Amino acid sequence: MKDEQLYYFEKSPVFKAMMHFSLPMMIGTLLSVIYGILNIYFIGFLEDSHMISAISLTLPVFAILMGLGNLFGVGAGTYISRLLGAKDYSKSKFVSSFSIYGGIALGLIVILVTLPFSDQIAAILGARGETLALTSNYLKVMFLSAPFVILFFILEQFARAIGAPMISMIGMLASVGLNIILDPILIFGFDLNVVGAALGTAISNVAAALFFIIYFMKNSDVVSVNIKLAKPNKEMLSEIFKIGIPAFLMSILMGFTGLVLNLFLAHYGNFAIASYGISFRLVQFPELIIMGLCEGVVPLIAYNFMANKGRMKDVIKAVIMSIGVIFVVCMIAVFTIGHHMVGLFTTDQAIVEMATFILKVTMASLLLNGIGFLFTGMLQATGQGRGATIMAILQGAIIIPVLFIMNALFGLTGVIWSLLIAESLCALAAMLIVYLLRDRLTVDTSELIEG
């Protein structure tokens, strides 16, 4: 490993190390918002609602591909960080090689089992009429690019795992930048419409994956792309998948709960959907910053879980304090200028009032949401597979019964408050799991929870 990477893992001031690992991840998570709207933005110029619907309907498929990337990326990435903390550099080469080629194989399987059934999958996603063929065509490109999409997510995680978060950010920036260039060329220049949008995203993922591969081949002595080293054993598979499977489940369940919430809101009409949509876009930015903060320090926690548990404790304290500061600043902003913030999106006073109310409730859950993110990341980093699995399931399962109960008792207001209640229960569950696992973590987590 490079001396600079070891410095941030082992010796730099805790806050400096936290920002070194987290800042690129924060920027990356914010870029993901841009990434998600690029295709719709360019397709919007064609003024064809069927094309916009086709792209929107494919989002669950992208979430699944991202989840498959996390299966190897998060699972192997946290394991690699722990191996580096234990100075077991040779084993990390075997882990990385197996995960890279395992991810590619998984992508090829996706092509085989989905490509022949793209029309049927489009129909399952809700495509009808003119939208069906457009959605199917978009899906075909997505399925064909699956190996590279999965590989991109794996390699991006590996860059952070070895202490090179800036490389991770550069890869994401390159992918988004190339997509911005390619989309208008393919959509308008070659008149490919939704297929052009899909190709722009696919080519961007291929380019980013190749960037990471070239970087690791030239600069890393702990991540290997040598297929001869892709030899798994029982211990390796256990360490990868006990964390990778919960990460995969979390990606899938988060998308599912979002779908369920939309169904509840749809019951109250466009007024409710529009109000929530505005508040969601406003709360999304601080939420993504906190998510980037918590995910960014996962390699730092994993490394010091093996190398220096006192430093690991200091990192967790620093993250909790940072989450608290972000929460206080956001709450002050919402309760002082929240009405004006919502007014930037609409002049409809009824929607402004409802969206402002929703914004206050959802922003109030930011602290608890952050604690949940941090402790889930901590369980992943330290290899606590059972705890991570329980948290992944709870984050998807808790909100559904809460939504049904609150909707039955209080209607739309209950649906809105269910978000805060569910986040509170998830945060309490995370604290309880970490407390119960305190002996395995060998760090005084009870002090963190009480303090």
From Swiss-Prot:
Top-level taxon of the source organism: Bacteria
Major localisation: membrane
Gene Ontology cellular component terms for the protein in this record: plasma membrane
A Gene Ontology molecular function term of the record: antiporter activity
One Pfam family in the UniProt entry: MatE
TM regions (residue ranges): 26-46, 54-74, 97-117, 139-159, 170-190, 194-214, 245-265, 282-302, 318-338, 355-375, 397-417, 418-438
Example of a GO biological process term: response to antibiotic
Keyword list, A-Z: Antibiotic resistance, Cell membrane, Membrane, Transmembrane, Transmembrane helix, Transport
Induction statement: Repressed by MepR.
The keyword Metal-binding is annotated on this UniProt entry: no
Subcellular location: Cell membrane
Membrane topology: Multi-pass membrane protein
InterPro entries per the UniProt record, alphabetical: MATE_fam (IPR002528), MATE_MepA-like (IPR045070), MATE_MepA_subfamily (IPR051327), MdtK-like (IPR048279)
Family, similarity comment: Belongs to the multi antimicrobial extrusion (MATE) (TC 2.A.66.1) family. MepA subfamily.
Entry function: Multidrug resistance efflux protein. Contributes to resistance to the glycylcycline antibiotic tigecycline.
PANTHER family: MULTIDRUG EXPORT PROTEIN MEPA, SPORULATION PROTEIN YKVU
The name this protein goes by in its record: Multidrug export protein MepA
